[in-house]
Amino acid sequence: MARRMPGPTCCGDARRNFCDDLHGVRGKFPRLAIATSTDLFHWKKQGLAFRQQLDGRFCRDFRSKSGSIVCKREGDRFIAEKINGKYWMYFGEFGISLASSKTLVNWEIALDKKGEQPLLVAPMRKGEPWFDQETTESGSQAFITGDGIFMIYDGMAPQRPDLALTGKIWSAGQILFDLKDLTKVIGRTDRDFFHPEKDYEKQNVTKGAGGANNVTFISNLIYFGGKWRFYYGCADSRVACAVSTK
């Protein structure tokens, strides 16, 4: 029997590769969940990603979203790849952490010696117009390259005087993790490479939905037809695609 969750609910910000994830929202707490499919039309919801760890500690009033599973690229496909016998996933909302799994369904957060969740990618320091000075969040799927594990991430700043934008502004940066130590950051952009410019990226068009302005929020990266493309949310009300040949 299905159980109705109290408060507003939704599923959103899915990341798709050869495995999948999404996050569900119960009231004010987003929580990472897993869904699987063999044909991309029919989906099975597998439940909350961290439900088995520490007797469900990370299912009760614990914010988790935006899972980016580490993959390898084979042609146009991104396939979840085991490293040291496990699958790995970067995730987080106000900072990026790491989790592992043997099944791609049940996940465990990599905790420190005190049993706490460390942030591998924290917001940039305050005092300058950093694009991610308030929030860092996993964006595209992470994938293995010759230099390390590459991932696009989303960052938020309370204002961007360099762009003449005010309010919360969501932009995108790039990060590189060490393949031998997945907790180690070996490269990170100081400036965003993608930010709100178009009217549909700056202005939310959904009246009464509580959406935000000034948002370019990247969720998926694909390689197709010899070009890199990513899909991204625009001002919490539309979806667009950006293309690069580099």
Question: Where do the PLM segments sit?
Answer:
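Beta-rich carbohydrate-recognition and catalytic domains
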Residues: 1-4, 12-134, 143-211, 225-246
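Extended, compositionally biased non-globular segments
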Residues: 207-209, 216-221
